[in-house]
Amino acid sequence: EIYDRMVMDGHVHTPVASLAPDVFCVSMNGLSKSHRIAGFRVGWMVLSGPKHHVKGYIEGLNMLSNMRLCSNVLAQQVVQTSLGGHQSVDELLLPGGRIYEQRNFIYNAIQDIPGLSAVKPKAGLYIFPKIDRNMYRIDDDEQFVLNFLKQEKVLLVHGRGFNWQEPDHFRIVYLPRVDELAQIQEK
């Protein structure tokens, strides 16, 4: 649920656990995406649904949480304050907002490149373009992104890194500002 606050274009996030309340579900969330503090590993998990058949699992979680592997207490205290009140991410996801405009820019840039296509993201910080392999002879998406990194100094992630079966996709993070994304488009 880490992208639950990162939805755009009037879409609403639906928690997975709400789709089947009669099924035990472990949901995890945190601040790293919605508050744009990547690497700030503070988060939580919610156990929902019937728990009678997962008592051993819950006991294991409790045991783990009570071991010497304690959380960063100060960081955990930030969570409640961060989730209440004004949420600056909301403004970034509306028309005119930085993330919204960056998403639109990279989506349109991809559509303008012959042989590339993408579905416009409804949430998150990434776009997953598809490469027309009839136009571009790419048989190894990992080698493609490594070559692109070496030649153009732009970091992409190969699609098979996300369990995509065919070597015809890659991931772009659209967090850089539009002027930086425009430089990437030229490459």
Regions inferred by a protein language model and the residue ranges of each:
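Conserved glycine-rich beta-strand-loop-beta hairpin in the small C-terminal domain of fold type I
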Residues: 76, 80, 96-110, 118-132, ...
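PLP-dependent enzyme catalytic core of the Aspartate aminotransferase-like
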Residues: 137-139, 147-156, 162-187
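Residue-level recognition of strand-loop junctions within catalytic nucleotide-signaling folds
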Residues: 48, 84, 130-132, 175-177
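Conserved PLP phosphate-binding loop immediately N-terminal to the Schiff-base lysine helix
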Residues: 1-15
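Short, conserved active-site loop motifs that form the nucleotide-linked donor/cofactor pocket
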Residues: 25, 116, 154
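Conserved core segment of the aminotransferase class I/II
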Residues: 18-97, 107-109
